[in-house]
């Protein structure tokens, strides 16, 4: 048994010596100071975009401070999406057609009528 423990001890010492000389051990990560990413994470995008310093920022720094925007919430009907704009455009067009059929647009002087467009084509 003593021969086995000596062999085990010798193999462990050899492995430690080889890993230290060949650089196979765990490399120590160097800390090189602030980077743009770390500053952006700690200060948030509003601080980097306006180039404010640490002293100008009031309150705690970090992304935890930022509130989620109401527009990004799923199920919100007030958000300006292309779908909402299309629906609004269709509703406005249908309202325009309804007013045109009712004759309400004939009293407005700023809109050209269909008769005046025909008169312009004839002359």
From Swiss-Prot:
Compartments, as annotated in UniProt: Secreted
Transmembrane segments: none
Entry keyword NADP: no
Propeptide feature: residues: 20-30
Domain of life: Eukaryota
GO term, biological process aspect, one: neuropeptide signaling pathway
Main subcellular location of this protein, as a coarse class: secreted
GO cellular component assignments: extracellular space; secretory granule
InterPro entries membership: Galanin, Galanin_pre, GMAP
Alanine amide PTM positions: 61
Record region (Disordered): 53-79
Assigned protein family: Belongs to the galanin family.
Protein name (Swiss-Prot/TrEMBL): Galanin peptides
């Amino acid at each position: 048994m003593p021969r086995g423990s000596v062999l085990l001890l010798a193999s462990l010492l050899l492995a430690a010596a080889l890993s230290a000389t060949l650089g196979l051990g765990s490399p120590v990560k160097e800390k090189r100071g602030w980077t743009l990413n770390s500053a952006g994470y700690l200060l948030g995008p509003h601080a980097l975009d306006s180039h404010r310093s640490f002293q100008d920022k009031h309150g705690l720094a970090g992304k935890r401070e930022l509130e989620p925007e109401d527009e990004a919430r799923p199920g919100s009907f007030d958000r300006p999406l292309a779908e909402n704009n299309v629906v609004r455009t269709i509703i406005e067009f249908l309202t325009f057609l309804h007013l045109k059929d009712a004759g309400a647009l004939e009293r407005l002087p700023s809109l050209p009528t269909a008769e005046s467009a025909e008169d312009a084509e004839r002359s």
